[in-house]
Amino acid sequence: MNVAELKSRLQSSPDHSVSILLPDGDRVPRHFHVTEVGHVAKKFVDCGGTFRSSETCVLQALVGSDDHHRLTAGRLAHILELAKPILPMTDLPVEIEYEEGVISQFPLQEIIAEGASLTLQLGLKHTDCLAKDKCGMESGCCSDGESGEDEGGACCGDAGEGQGCCK
């Protein structure tokens, strides 16, 4: 879900409460705060040598000690409006950053209307090799071929010299 879609849904139900449903089915305690809205730009090179970039809008959720606090959809829409100067476009995908033992970022998959509440359903992010065609991961070179166990990291060889990964 992107910023424009999120704002539209929030603005259409400004008096609704907002809750967050984690991918494992647990809920973030209802007295959470959104303490940051960030524009995160990531520039990187994959293991095959291709330069890439990605951008997201990250909302940081923090559970405070004030357990009577409840965030409304209208208030969250207002917070997103305040962030407009730092968000270069409204089609940025939205992620929620939340700490429960470790800080994790979860993509916002959908918003579910439940009575007078909007539930932000979060998904999972996964790692992947972006240069499978260059490093040989499609052929399973990073597994031992029998158990499927990983023998090393993704693309640990020089793909430019035709060695593929883990060779």
Predicted regions and their residues:
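Small/polar-rich, solvent-exposed N-terminal microdomains that initiate assembly or binding
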Residues: 7-36
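Short, solvent-exposed beta-alpha or beta-beta edge segments that form flexible loop/patches at the rim
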Residues: 28-50
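Short connector loops at helix/strand junctions that flank enzyme active sites
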Residues: 29-31, 52-56, 89-91
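Oligomerization/assembly interface segments of phage tail-like spikes and tubes
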Residues: 53-65, 122-124
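Short, conserved charged micro-motifs
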Residues: 67-73
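Short amphipathic alpha-helices in soluble, non-transmembrane regions
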Residues: 73-79
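Helix-rich interaction surfaces within compact, conserved domain-sized segments
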Residues: 82-134
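Cysteine-cluster motifs in flexible loop/terminal segments that predominantly coordinate metals
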Residues: 126-167
